[in-house]
């Protein structure tokens, strides 16, 4: 069904968050069923790995979504990197019910993994408010960079 563009049958694939290591590519992504449309059931990050972008190994949901009462009812985009201690994911948690209750609907979150496949979420939301000029309802999709010179 797919070549180069990974798409499981019957699923909308969105927000690809790639990570590569030693010729292996981790293709983290969102799977939206669009059921009911246009914004379907809550989702986490799914994972497929590949070495050639033709053949894939599908792991299904790798970073699990939260409950309907948690900040990460949906797990929106983010980024993955690796340190000596393992993998880190910084991502956006979104809850579509929070705005109605007067809560912040999007928050930055963190998870760790030993293998890049199974993730453990940190318990605390990150206290990183949007800078002046950014929409507080659309503060999301963190991307982490390593500064070689400063080693941070």
Predicted feature locations:
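Beta-rich carbohydrate-recognition and catalytic domains
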Residues: 1-152
């Amino acid at each position: 069904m797919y070549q180069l563009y990974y798409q499981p049958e019957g699923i909308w694939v969105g927000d690809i968050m790639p990570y590569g290591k030693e010729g292996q590519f981790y293709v983290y992504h969102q799977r939206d069923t669009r059921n009911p449309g246009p914004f379907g059931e809550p989702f986490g990050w799914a994972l497929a790995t590949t070495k050639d972008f033709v053949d894939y190994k599908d792991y299904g949901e790798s970073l699990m979504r939260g409950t309907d009462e948690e900040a990460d009812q949906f797990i929106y985009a983010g980024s993955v990197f690796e340190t000596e201690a393992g993998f880190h994911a910084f991502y956006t948690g979104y809850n579509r019910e929070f705005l109605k209750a007067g809560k912040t609907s999007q928050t930055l979150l963190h998870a760790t993994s030993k293998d890049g496949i199974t993730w453990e979420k940190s318990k605390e939301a990150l206290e990183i408010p949007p800078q002046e000029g950014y929409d507080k309802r659309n503060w999301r999709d963190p991307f982490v960079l390593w500064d070689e010179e400063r080693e941070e």
